[in-house]
């Protein structure tokens, strides 16, 4: 039987960013928290990171939030917006019929996102990291709130476009189109470095979603086994001439730690 308070609270999942600045949730020592990140931004870049974060909020709230977000940036190395972590409902995969969505496909995505952030599942749930130390679902809690609001409104003839946790909006599509198109970690490997990625991540313009964190479909180690198998199968088809009906039987794979 569903917990009545949880079901009632779940009705608020589509509220988006509250009109008024919410109270700061208590720091929860019962969950693991991500360690502070390296300080990689200059003073001018920190101002840019603040502007990027404040774009989600009305101008009249910027003065109140800027100091808090700067403190997060200076102590943690990223702006997480802990103040906006929802507490009215339990963060877990609820029965799909409990989600206040117009589209069951959208409700299933909401369920998957909440599963990725479930404290019983995620590595650092309050920092929106599912696994691997940096496998992020979103960059901050404002993005989570906006995405849940969009998914509540979505119909089966719309597509939500995501860019490293940032929702670009709902776009007209068709019932045969994807409900969500996700991109993460948009870096050019041969023209970039780890330091450059960390800088852009601290600025709030890119995130690393790992294989199944930023795509909302983490199912534990079996997901990585599945993804790795598909990767190897496609490599064998491309380089060994396997057709679509052949498996990897008889193929020797040598790895240096994959």
Predicted regions mapped to residue ranges:
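Short linear motifs at secondary-structure transitions and domain/linker junctions
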Residues: 86-87, 137-138, 157, 253-255
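Intrinsically disordered, low-structural-confidence terminal and linker regions
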Residues: 1-104
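Glycine/serine-rich phosphate-binding loop and adjoining beta1-alpha1 elements at the start
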Residues: 100, 106-248
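Glycine-rich adenosine-cofactor-binding loop
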Residues: 248-258
């Amino acid at each position: 039987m569903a917990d009545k308070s949880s079901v009632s609270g779940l009705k608020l999942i589509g509220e988006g960013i509250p009109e008024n600045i919410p109270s700061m949730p208590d720091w929860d020592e019962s969950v693991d928290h991500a360690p502070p990140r390296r300080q990689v931004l200059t003073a001018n870049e920190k101002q840019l990171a603040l502007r990027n974060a404040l774009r989600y909020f009305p101008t009249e709230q910027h003065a109140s939030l800027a100091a808090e977000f700067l403190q997060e940036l200076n102590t943690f190395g990223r702006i997480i917006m802990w103040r906006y972590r929802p507490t009215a409902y339990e963060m877990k995969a609820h029965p799909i019929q409990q989600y206040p969505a117009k589209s069951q496909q959208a409700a299933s995505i909401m369920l998957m996102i909440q599963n990725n952030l479930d404290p019983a599942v995620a590595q650092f749930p309050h920092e929106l990291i599912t696994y691997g130390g940096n496998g992020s679902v979103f960059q901050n809690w404002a993005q989570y709130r906006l995405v849940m609001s969009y998914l509540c409104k979505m119909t089966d003839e719309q597509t939500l476009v995501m860019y490293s946790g940032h929702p670009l909006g709902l776009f007209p599509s068709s019932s045969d189109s994807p409900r969500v198109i996700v991109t993460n970690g948009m870096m050019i490997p041969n023209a970039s470095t780890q330091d450059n990625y960390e800088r852009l991540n601290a600025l709030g313009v890119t995130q690393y979603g790992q294989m199944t964190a930023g795509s909302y479909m983490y199912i534990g180690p079996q997901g990585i086994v599945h993804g790795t198998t598909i990767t190897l199968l496609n490599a064998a088809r491309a380089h060994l001439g396997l057709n679509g009906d052949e498996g990897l039987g008889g193929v020797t794979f040598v790895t240096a730690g994959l």
